[in-house]
Amino acid sequence: MRSSASRLSSFSSRDSLWNRMPDQISVSEFIAETTEDYNSPTTSSFTTRLHNCRNTVTLLEEALDQDRTALQKVKKSVKAIYNSGQDHVQNEENYAQVLDKFGSNFLSRDNPDLGTAFVKFSTLTKELSTLLKNLLQGLSHNVIFTLDSLLKGDLKGVKGDLKKPFDKAWKDYEMKFTKIEKEKREHAKQHGMIRTEITGAEIAEEMEKERRLFQLQMCEYLIKVNEIKTKKGVDLLQNLIKYYHAQCNFFQDGLKTADKLKQYIEKLAADLYNIKQTQDEEKKQLTALRDLIKSSLQLDPKEVGGLYVPSRANSDSQSRQGGYSMHQLQGNKEYGSEKKGFLLKKSDGIRKVWQRRKCAVKNGILTISHATSNRQPAKLNLLTCQVKPNAEDKKSFDLISHNRTYHFQAEDEQDYVAWISVLTNSKEEALTMAFRGEQSTGENSLEDLTKAIIEDVQRLPGNDICCDCGSSEPTWLSTNLGILTCIECSGIHREMGVHISRIQSLELDKLGTSELLLAKNVGNNSFNDIMEANLPSPSPKPTPSSDMTVRKEYITAKYVDHRFSRKTCASSSAKLNELLEAIKSRDLLALIQVYAEGVELMEPLLEPGQELGETALHLAVRTADQTSLHLVDFLVQNCGNLDKQTSVGNTVLHYCSMYGKPECLKLLLRSKPTVDIVNQNGETALDIAKRLKATQCEDLLSQAKSGKFNPHVHVEYEWNLRQDEMDESDDDLDDKPSPIKKERSPRPQSFCHSSSISPQDKLALPGFSTPRDKQRLSYGAFTNQIFVSTSTDLPTSPTSEAPPLPPRNAGKGPTGPPSTLPLGTQTSSGSSTLSKKRSPPPPPGHKRTLSDPPSPLPHGPPNKGAIPWGNDVGPSSSSKTANKFEGLSQQASTSSAKTALGPRVLPKLPQKVALRKTETSHHLSLDRANIPPETFQKSSQLSELPQKPPLGDLPPKPMELAPKPQIGELPPKPGELPPKPQLGDLPPKPQLSDLPPKPQMKDLPPKPQLGDLLAKSQASDLSAKVQPPSEVTQRSHTGDLSPNVQSRDAIQKQASEDSNDLTPTLPETPVPLPRKINTGKNKVRRVKTIYDCQADNDDELTFIEGEVIIVTGEEDQEWWIGHIEGQPERKGVFPVSFVHILSD
C-alpha cells in the first residue's frame, strides 16, 4: 500500500496521472458510498473504496499545484502591464504639459493659430491619458485583485498543505486497522485457525470512529477544492469580462475624443499649407536681399562670393588642355549643393543656337530637361564631370563630361557664381559620400529607385488628378488599390479602415518599393474604368469643391458597396472562373474586375491545382516571378484570411518556402500572417525553408517569428521604368535643320503567341523575355518567322500561326526571298506544342522608325529583283545589306533525298524611300565571320513547306475590307523541331562599338525632286539586271554544299558584300519630307485582332486575340495607330497584318 502511494507521488503530469490511475472516485460516488456507510455500517462496502479516495486526493493535489504555478505567472504578467501602463500615463502627462507650454509661447507671440493647434493636441493627449488611467484601474481592480485573493488565500502555501488533515486521518485509520487485524490473527491462532483476510463487516463497529474521521476530512478537502475551482474558473472569468467592458469603453471613448478634433485637423492641414507658402515667400525675399547685399560688398573681381575664378591667362591655358585639370574649382559653401533653375545651353548641332533649359542639381546629379515634356530628362553624374569657367564670357561656363562638353550660360554674373558653386559643392559632396562606403551608396540607390518609381506612377494616365474628386496633383496613395487621392479624400479612405484602403503619403512617408507595386501597374484611369463604369446620371461623383459629407457618401458607395462597378458575372462559379483566368493570364485589371464584383478572393479554385483546395493566392505565388508580383500584392492586401490551407495543410507561406519565392514572402509578411501553422507533415513554413535550404525564405521567416521584420521592404521586380541614358543629348530634337529624326536604337523582334498558351509556356517562347534579357535575345531570334511544335506526336492545333511583326527599323528592300535562321537556335525545348495562324509576312524592305520617309518605288509592276527561291540568282546591290539576316538560305535534308523549301511569293513593297546608306544600316548586323557554323545548323527533319499564295499587289487600303484568312488556305506546320542549341552556339551579343555611328545632319542629302526619284528607280532596276557572272555561278552551286559549309560560306559572302556595297556609279538616295500621320477620318474604323501581340516599346500596343481596336490614324501602310475599344488608355501603334478589318 505504501509503495503504491510512493509511486503515485512520483507522477508530475496531470494527464499521465489520470491516465495511469483508473481507480478513482467521483464526488457523487463518494457521497453515495459515505451515506450508505453511515446508515448501515455492517453492510457497507465503503472500506473497499478507501484506496480510490486516496488516489483521487493525490490527483487533485497535483492539478491544484499546476494551477497555482500558472496563476502566479499570470499575476506577474498583469502586474508588469499595469506598471508599464502607469509609466506610460505619466510620460503622456509630461508630454501634454510641455506641449501646452510650447503652444502658450506661440499664443503670446505673433502666431496664435499655431499656438492654438499645439494646445489642442496637448488637450487631446491629456484626455487620452485619463482614459488609459481608468483602464489601468479596471485592470487592477478586476484582474490583479482577484488573482491576489486567490493566491494569498485558498491556494496559499506549497504543494500538499491542503491535504495534510486528510493524510492524518488516513494514517490513523491504517494504524487502527493494522492493530485490529493483528489481534484477530492472534486470536485465531490461539484456537488453531489461520485467518487469511478480515472483512469490513467484522471490524465495522470497532473502526467506526476512525472511518468517520476519514470521511469528514475527505468532505472538507472536496469542499475546499470546489471553492478553489469556482474562484479560479467562474469568478476569474467574470472579472475578465468586466475588464473587457472597460477596454471597450476605453477604445470607444478614445475614438470619440479623437473625432472631436477631426474637422479642426482637416482645416488645420489646409491652413498649415498656406502658412508654409507665406514663410517660403519670406525666405525667398530674404535670400534675394542677402545676395544683393553680398554682391555689393564684393571688392576683388577675382574673388566673387568666396568662389575662386582663375585669371584669363590661366583660363586660356586650361581651355587648351581640353581635359581635366589637376586642381578643381572651390565653390562657395553658402550656396549649398542643390539648385533648380534655368540655363542657356548651346546646341552641338549645325546652328549652334542657345536653348533655354530647365536644370536641377541634387545628390551629385545634374538633370537637364528637354524641350519636349514627354521625354525623360538627361542626367549627368558630376563625379565624372569638370566645371570650367569661360574666359571670354563672364556668364558662361563649360561642363566637361566623359563623352562631350556642355556649354552653359547663366542669366547674370550672380547666377553664374551660384551655379558654379552648387555644381562644385554637389560634386564634392558626392565624392565624400562615395568614400564613406558601399552602405550609403546602396541606400541612396534604393531611394533613387523609389523616387523614379513614384515619378513614373505620377505620370500614369489619370494620376494627375484625384481618383475620387478630380483635385489636381494628388499625393496620397492607396497602397492596396494602386490609386492616388487628394488629402481630403484620403481622410475618408482612412475612416473606412485598412481592410478597404491603406493610405500612405508619397511625400511625407518613407515608402518601400513593395508599397508601390500596385501603384505602378494600376493608375486612376484604369481603376475608374472598372469602379465607375456604371455611374448614374446625374453623376454623384464629388468635385474638388465638394464638402466632406458628399465625398464620404460617394467614396463609401464606391469602395465599400462597389455600387458603380461594372458587372460581368452572373454566378459565383463564373466569378471564380474569371478569378482563375485573371491569375493565369496575369491580368491585374481583370483581377480588379472580379474583386469589384465581390468575389471571395480566398475561396478554393474550381480547377484543381498542384494540391486540392488551392486558392488564387496559392496559384499566384506558385507561378510568380519578377514580372507578376503585383498580382500577389493585390491578393495579399485585399483578401481577408492569409492562413487558408490546402487539403494537405499548406498555407501560402508554405508555398513560398516550397517553391522558393522570397519576394512573395516579403509581400505576405507585411500583412502579418500566422507563421507557425503546420501542415499534415507537421512542418511549418520555416521548417520547409530549412529543409530545402531556402536561405532567403528562412531568414525572412525567422525575422517575422522574432518580430524583427520590416514591412517597408524592397522587392526585386521588373519595374520597366522609362529612363533614358545618363548622358543623353537632346540636340537632335532641338536643332531640326531637316525633317529627319534621330533613329531609334535597335529593338528586338516582336513575338506573338496564341491566347491558349499558359503564362509559363509564353515565358518559354523565344523572344518572350524580361526586359533585362530582351536585348540579348533579340539578336538570336531576330529573323525567326516560323514557330514549330516541340512535340511531333501531337496533332496540329486548329489555331493557325501568326505572322511576325513588321520590323520597325529603316532598311533597304530585298529583291530576293528572305530565309530564316535555323529554328534550333531560337526555340526553347521547354515550350509546349505551339501552332499559330500563319499569314504572309509583311514586306521586309520597310522597317518602321520615327524617321521613315515615303518610298520612291513607282506604282505599277513589282520590283524586278523579286525572284522565287527556286531561281535565286543573287540579290541586287540595293538589297544586299537588308538581307543580312534574311539571306541565309535553309536546306532541310531527309534520309532519302534533299528537300528544298518551296517558293514564297512576297507582296509588293509599300512605296517607301530606302532612307539610309549602306554604311548606316548595320545596326542589327553581327560579325558573321566570327560566328561558329553550328549557330546556323539547320534541322535534319523539316517537312516540305507548300508554296504560299500571292497576296496581291499591295496591302489593303485603310478603308477597304481585308478578308480574314481561312484555315484551309494556310500552309501546314513544319514537322520536327531541331535540337536545342547550346549556350556556346549562340552568336555573341553585339557591343556598342559594333553599332554604326549616328548619322549627322550634314550627311543627309537635300530634299528630292521628282526627277531624282525616277532616276533612282531606273538605276535600281538596272543594277538588278547586271550581276557579275561569278556571283551568279557561285550562288547556283550552294545547294550542293553541306548545311554547315553553306551557312559558313553565306555568312562570309554576306560580310564581304556588306563591306563592298558602296557603288559610286549610283546616285545617292534623296531624302523627302516625312510622311504625315493620317489621323483625319470621317468614319470610325474598327478592326478585330486575330493574334496575340506583345509590345516591345512604350508606343506600341499590346493586345490579345479577339479584341476590337478603334483606328485613329496611320503611321504607314504596315503600322496603324489606335486604341482598344472601351479602353482608350490602351493605345499605341500596331501591325496591320495582325488584325482583320470589320465591315461596320
Swiss-Prot record:
Compositionally biased spans, kind Polar residues: 312-330, 747-759, 1030-1049
Pfam families: Ank_2, ArfGap, BAR_3, PH, SH3_9
GO biological process, one term: regulation of postsynapse organization
Residues recorded as bearing Phosphoserine in the entry: 729, 738, 851, 855, 1023, 1042, 1056, 1143
Domain of life: Eukaryota
One GO CC annotation: Golgi membrane
Zinc finger (C4-type) boundaries: 466-489
Keyword field contains Cytoplasm: yes
Residue intervals of the Arf-GAP domain: 451-574
InterPro entries for this protein: AH/BAR_dom_sf, Ankyrin_rpt, Ankyrin_rpt-contain_sf, ARFGAP/RecO, ArfGAP_dom, ArfGAP_dom_sf, ASAP, ASAP1_BAR
Compositionally biased residues, Acidic residues: 725-734
GO molecular function: GTPase activator activity; phosphatidylinositol-3,4,5-trisphosphate binding; phosphatidylinositol-4,5-bisphosphate binding; phosphatidylserine binding; zinc ion binding
Activity regulation: Activity stimulated by phosphatidylinositol 4,5-bisphosphate (PIP2).
Feature: compositional bias, Basic and acidic residues: 735-746, 916-926
Domain PH positions: 336-428
Biased composition (Pro residues): 947-958, 971-981
Ranges where the record places region Disordered: 308-330, 722-771, 790-1077
Biased composition (Low complexity): 790-800, 821-834, 889-900
Entry keyword set: ANK repeat, Cilium biogenesis/degradation, Cytoplasm, Golgi apparatus, GTPase activation, Membrane, Metal-binding, Phosphoprotein, Repeat, SH3 domain, Zinc, Zinc-finger
Entry keyword annotation includes RNA-binding: no
Domains: entry comment: The PH domain most probably contributes to the phosphoinositide-dependent regulation of ADP ribosylation factors.
Name listed for the protein in its UniProt record: Arf-GAP with SH3 domain, ANK repeat and PH domain-containing protein 1
